[in-house]
Amino acid sequence: VQSMVLTACKRGDEIILPRNVHRSVLNALVLCGAVPVYVNPEVDKRLGISLGMKREQVAKAIKEHPNAVAVLVNNPTYYGICSDLRAIVKMAHDAGMLCLADEAHGTHFYFGGGLPVSAMAAGADMASVSMHKSGGSLTQSSLLLTGPNVHAGYVRQIINLTQTTSGSYLLMSSLDISRRNLAPVSYTHLRAHETLANL
């Protein structure tokens, strides 16, 4: 997440994001000096949980802060709530902004049909996917996915600033094994989970 934010933002840049972001996003803002423009998601009064950002809230933030360089979305939130990601990506791009996604709890979106759209399928520019949370890889391992609007060489440069240059082959191999395990069986497993959830 830090590398994603540091790739998109420089000192003084504004970034639009929900108030319920992970602290790693806030740490990235401290490191790069970017200025947060918070969108306050509504709270479901019955469940007492924060919801996702509404299209109208994002549109208002973009209109009020046209010089922002990026919009960051939780996809999904910690509680599994998804925003209208396709619409938010389009709004960001129409305004000349990048769209970044924290997919800490959205690993499964890449491996099964009938699920909410993954950030990259929605056209986001970057997504941080925490395979270790719901994909089965070792703790601390995650994927940083990039789209065509982001220069991969620059991303590598930022990663080298924030992380060790001696990557853990144990962590990297656990990512690959988890991806391999999820791909062929994902549809069957996700349908079984969906069936259980609907009981």
Stretches with model-predicted labels:
Residues 17-18, 38-39, 72-73, 99-103, ...:
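General beta-strand structural signal in soluble alpha/beta enzymes
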Residues 188-195:
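Conserved small/polar residues in nucleotide/adenosyl-binding loops
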Residues 47-108:
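Active-site phosphate-binding strand-loop segment of PLP-dependent enzymes
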Residues 32-33, 95, 122-123:
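Short, structured coil segments at secondary-structure junctions
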Residues 118-157, 163-174:
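Active-site PLP attachment segment
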Residues 1-3:
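Short loop-beta-helix segment that forms the pyridoxal 5′-phosphate
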Residues 8-25:
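Conserved PLP-anchoring active-site segment centered on the Schiff-base-forming lysine
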Residues 173-186:
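Amphipathic alpha-helix from the class-I
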